[in-house]
Design a protein with these regions (language model features):
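Phosphate-binding loop that captures ATP/GTP phosphates
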Residues: 1-46, 57
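Signal for well-folded cores of large energy- and translation-related assemblies
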Residues: 5-12, 61-68, 91, 95, ...
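Short, hinge-like loop/turn segments at secondary-structure boundaries
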Residues: 9-16, 117-120, 146-152, 187-190
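Loop/turn-to-beta-strand initiation segments
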Residues: 32-35, 70-75, 98
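Phosphate-binding/switch loop-helix module in NTP-utilizing enzymes
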Residues: 40-90
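Conserved catalytic-core segment of NTP-binding enzymes
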Residues: 73-74, 80-180
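C-terminal boundary of histidine-terminating zinc-finger modules
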Residues: 182-196
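Histidine-centered active-site loop/cap adjacent to the catalytic His
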Residues: 193-215
Length: 219
């Protein structure tokens, strides 16, 4: 999304063009060893990106076909919620290993997550759902680090995953440090030995385990 330059502390950076076998390709911007490409690099930070579905889909496709990603461990694509043109274009353009569904616990958000799972599992798409992540699962104030307040309900995404027979990957708490880290361009995972960093670390390990099992089934 267009906010990625801010979240990776890359505001003002611009991807460079590189020559690869006689073809000019976009070189992703490096952020501590992570290659990043975003529409936000090509638009003014304060201007709205008002594109119809086909134009947005074309732009997404170009971030794959016109970029020099090189050797990667993982290529992650952050998509907006919904079941529209962008999602279909991605499925039709890129051979995906799977998708991760992220939802907050309340029913109004779970309804979108449920539709997303159903879309990717359609016979015409058949994209594996690696699992579900519950974001903003609980609130923990800094002065009461042992307390959990379930502002948006409890275990909504976990129950959704169990009910739809897909893996549950983990929960991310609602804490001020995540907001501050995103605004400052310092990912929360860099906060050593904090509940937030530990939650992300556990989530990543579970994600890799589930993806490994999923790929083993297709061999």
């Amino acid at each position: 999304g267009p906010s990625m330059p801010t979240m990776f502390d890359l505001v003002g950076e611009r991807p460079q063009m590189v020559d690869v076998d006689g073809q000019g390709l976009i070189q992703p911007v490096d952020a501590k060893g992570i290659g990043v490409l975003s529409i936000g690099f090509f638009t003014d930070q304060d201007n709205a990106v008002v594109w119809r579905g086909p134009m947005a889909s074309k732009a997404l496709t170009q971030l794959f076909t016109d970029a020099h990603w090189g050797e990667l461990d993982f290529l992650l694509v952050d998509l907006p919620p919904g079941t529209g043109d962008i999602h279909l274009s991605l499925v039709q353009t890129v051979p995906l290993d799977g998708v991760v569904i992220v939802s907050t616990p309340q029913e109004v958000a779970l309804a979108d997550a449920r539709r997303g799972i159903n879309m990717f599992q359609m016979d015409t798409l058949k994209v594996p759902v690696i699992g579900v992540v519950e974001n903003m699962a609980w609130f923990t104030p800094a002065e009461l680090p042992e307390n959990k307040y379930y502002i948006f309900g409890r275990d909504g995404a976990k129950n959704l995953a169990n009910g739809m027979n897909v893996p549950f990957l983990g929960s991310i708490p609602l804490v001020q440090s995540v907001c501050e880290a995103g605004d400052a361009g310092r990912p929360a995972v860099y906060q050593e030995n904090t509940p937030t960093a530990l939650a992300f670390d556990e989530l990543v390990h579970t994600f890799v385990d589930e993806l490994t099992k999923l790929k083993a089934k297709t061999l």
